[in-house]
């Protein structure tokens, strides 16, 4: 996959303020505030920054955490996992493999078949219905 690289100023001009804060500055949207938290529409969730496919709606589940949750990405190559030791916690951050947009975190408390919960900020996603 060819990387998409832009300066922070280029990203700022392309994204709205909340998208920029979350995707480029590793912010987090408020729980239960994102437009995809309760969405059940069939489709594919793409990266808001580069349009790379990230998650299939078939892998989405209601975790009750306040953010869209998925038990697996659309492909292992779609994202990169990074150890995150911010805020006094040890977590695993997930970023888009193509453009390095911060997406959220993955936790080992999800449902079968993977046991994983990808907890993703809605503002980082664009749902393309089937």
From Swiss-Prot:
Its cofactor is Zn(2+). It catalyses: L-methionyl-[protein] + [thioredoxin]-disulfide + H2O = L-methionyl-(R)-S-oxide-[protein] + [thioredoxin]-dithiol. Binds 1 zinc ion per subunit. The zinc ion is important for the structural integrity of the protein. GO terms for molecular function: peptide-methionine (R)-S-oxide reductase activity; zinc ion binding. It comes from the Bacteria. Residues 8-130 form the MsrB domain. GO terms for biological process: protein repair; response to oxidative stress. Zn(2+) binds at residues 47, 50, 96, 99. The active site is at residue 119. Its EC number is 1.8.4.12. One of its GO terms (cellular component) is cytoplasm. Belongs to the MsrB Met sulfoxide reductase family. HAMAP family: MsrB. This is Peptide methionine sulfoxide reductase MsrB. It comes from Pseudomonas fluorescens (strain ATCC BAA-477 / NRRL B-23932 / Pf-5).
């Amino acid at each position: 996959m060819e990387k998409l690289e832009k300066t922070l100023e280029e990203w700022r001009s392309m994204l709205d303020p909340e998208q920029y804060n979350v995707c480029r500055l590793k912010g987090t949207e408020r729980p239960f505030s994102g437009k995809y938290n309760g969405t059940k529409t069939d489709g594919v969730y793409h990266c808001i920054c580069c349009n790379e496919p990230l998650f299939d709606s078939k892998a989405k589940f209601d975790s009750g955490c306040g953010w869209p949750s998925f038990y697996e990405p659309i492909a292992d190559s779609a994202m990169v996992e990074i150890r995150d030791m911010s805020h006094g916690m040890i977590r695993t951050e997930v970023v888009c493999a193509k453009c390095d947009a911060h997406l959220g975190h993955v936790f080992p408390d999800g449902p079968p078949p993977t046991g994983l919960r990808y907890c993703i900020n809605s503002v980082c996603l664009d749902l393309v219905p089937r």
